[in-house]
Amino acid sequence: MIPVADLTEAEAARELERLAAEIARHDRLYHQQDAPEITDGEYDALVRRNNEIEAAFPELVRGDSPSAHVGAAPAEGFAKVTHALPMLSLGNVFSDDEAREFDQRIRRFLSLDGETTISYVAEPKIDGLSFSARYENGVYRRAATRGDGTTGEDITANLATLTDLPQRLTGDGPVPEVLEVRGEVFMTKADFRALNQRQIDAGAKPFANPRNAAAGSLRQLDPEITRSRSLSLFAYASGEVKGLEVESHHAFLERLKTWGFPVNPQTRPCQGVEDLIEATHALALQRAALDYDIDGVVYKVDRVDWQKRLGFVSRAPRWAIARKFPAERAQTTVKAIQIQVGRTGTLTPVAILEPVTVGGVVVGRATLHNEDEIARKDVRIGDMVTIQRAGDVIPQVVEVLLDQRPADSAPFVFPETCPVCGSHAVRQEGEVARRCAGGLICSAQAVERLKHFVSRDAFDIEGLGGKHIETFHNEGLITQPADIFALEAKDNEPGALQHLRSREGWGPKSAENLFKAITARKTIPLDRFIYALGIRQVGQATARLLAGHYASFAAWRKAMDEAQTEGSEAFADLQNIESIGPSVARDLVAFFGEEHNRAALDALIDAGVEVLDFARPQAAGDSPLAGKTVVFTGTLDTMSRGEAKARALALGAKVTGSVSAKTDYVVVGADAGSKEKKARELGLTVLSEAEFRAMSGG
């Protein structure tokens, strides 16, 4: 693996693309199917590498970046619940120094001096399944899983079977009008052993680890199965709350205990970062003796007013972070090396391992990243290797045990042709990835692009899963996205080879439901439409930025056509969008430069797809900053630059890094420099920090 410091921009872009696809796949396996293929440590390693590359190359941050989304979509079979407030994930740190860096980031954001002590709360990070339980006037009403952070699965009846969950809030004083309690459902080690023994006695497959057992038990369509499993829970946070004011997170946890919620007794208030670090080491020493699995410690800023000021980044709060415990290792044999082909043609090698347990998780696969990584470590089929999982990172091969290498082993030869279509696998100068040159003739790419198109964050067509896409593509029924919307018409043709309703696994009702689901998705918001196209480096966050900037499909399409010339005003405007940059801009232009892509877009519109204009957050609608382009320059006195940008974005503004005639406001602090000068030359509105604070709500 090439160190981040040695990556070229092109290599970094390719690596981020690979990581986004790999992490998304493992999110689905973990959150939807409760069947992870890698350890938490291996997953964390992938996320960590992604974040390190993004920090080094901020202009390459993708919309589908793991730093911009949480979890995976709710599975079929469960009703969907939209969270009143998103259930976000957490960033990670792995060392004492990184914990201190977290503390310093908090200080910089809040503009605190070195004498001010930050109060924290340290909570054990339970390895279970997150939930949100809603109470109205003290009565339990609904519960949901995290899902993708915005929408989860309705587990109201299932969670009610847990004896740890209060059905009604009792105790001293009034109860809130609305209280969403968030926490983790888990299975103790003793209950896990007992459950697996029952599974074995019944001739059923045992669970791989307590986390899978807890998730699988809670996510049952029959609540009685959940009731039969011994599940526990700890409460640790709030969602939507009405009618309750607390000054600190610790005070909130104490209030939860008075209402009957279990709160982890290992939770500890800490004064300053050194106290946090000491608490982490103390808990690490107790880890093995605990009767439940933990994989780290969660650090939270205690003061609620500071939490509100700190706010959130795209997928996580700024005021909390997860400290992951060190990597756990094991040794196993490489049975095979498989090459996977992604939707953009990237060939990714994967080591197929003799299954081995690492830190309580059965691992059967490990990513080998790319051709250079295999060569550097000289990984061969038949080798005995050491693998590790560190925190939430995906399993990785650490080293080859050369003294145990078979005498007849041979170096792995990376293919120069696509294993799916036979086209050349080309490696461009300066890149680490080989890519299939087959394009649309490569069924692997075509199928993966179609799967992406119907995925939950794109068109979200329920009932049209990956296996169905593969079948319909192989039969020629769906070769491009527009074909999806013609599927019912094709099925009704008199000459159809086999009507969907008469196929194995289908029936009149399921066929009708699919056609209804397809029709219902003919109307789609602009940001989801852009994301669905599968443009390189354009994930959800980037798609939302583009949609917010151009507002309508017609305006975006026109701008992309005009941006075909790099020196054009349209191209300059595109790469000036916050977080876009030249690399993403070039990929967007390249997409529209291909005739077959433009034809595919036209075919979608001709098929009746209606792309809705971008809708800004309702709260931002009345803000004087809504829809305005804002540039910050100079040093601010009462808030950090990051806090100011976050405030502007939350109020519907577009924040860019350079001043142009299209800029609405330039907010200046001390030592503003050339940007202020240019703004005044252009006759733009220049705001002081005080004026910006007044405009943004004080």
From Swiss-Prot:
It catalyses: NAD(+) + (deoxyribonucleotide)n-3'-hydroxyl + 5'-phospho-(deoxyribonucleotide)m = (deoxyribonucleotide)n+m + AMP + beta-nicotinamide D-nucleotide. CDD domains: BRCT_DNA_ligase_like, LIGANc. SUPFAM superfamilies: BRCT domain (SSF52113), DNA ligase/mRNA capping enzyme, catalytic domain (SSF56091), Nucleic acid-binding proteins (SSF50249), RuvA domain 2-like (SSF47781). The active site is at residue 125. The keyword Nuclease does not apply. One of its GO terms (molecular function) is DNA ligase (NAD+) activity. One of its GO terms (cellular component) is cytosol. GO terms for biological process: DNA repair; DNA replication. Keywords: DNA damage, DNA repair, DNA replication, Ligase, Magnesium, Manganese, Metal-binding, NAD, Zinc. NAD(+) binds at residues 40-44, 89-90, 123, 146, 184, 300, 324. Zn(2+) binds at residues 418, 421, 436, 442. Its EC number is 6.5.1.2. Residues 620-698 form the BRCT domain. Its cofactor is Mg(2+); Mn(2+). It is an enzyme of class 6 (ligase). DNA ligase that catalyzes the formation of phosphodiester linkages between 5'-phosphoryl and 3'-hydroxyl groups in double-stranded DNA using NAD as a coenzyme and as the energy source for the reaction. It is essential for DNA replication and repair of damaged DNA. PANTHER family: CHROMOSOME TRANSMISSION FIDELITY FACTOR 18, DNA LIGASE. Belongs to the NAD-dependent DNA ligase family. LigA subfamily. This is DNA ligase. It comes from Rhodospirillum rubrum (strain ATCC 11170 / ATH 1.1.1 / DSM 467 / LMG 4362 / NCIMB 8255 / S1).
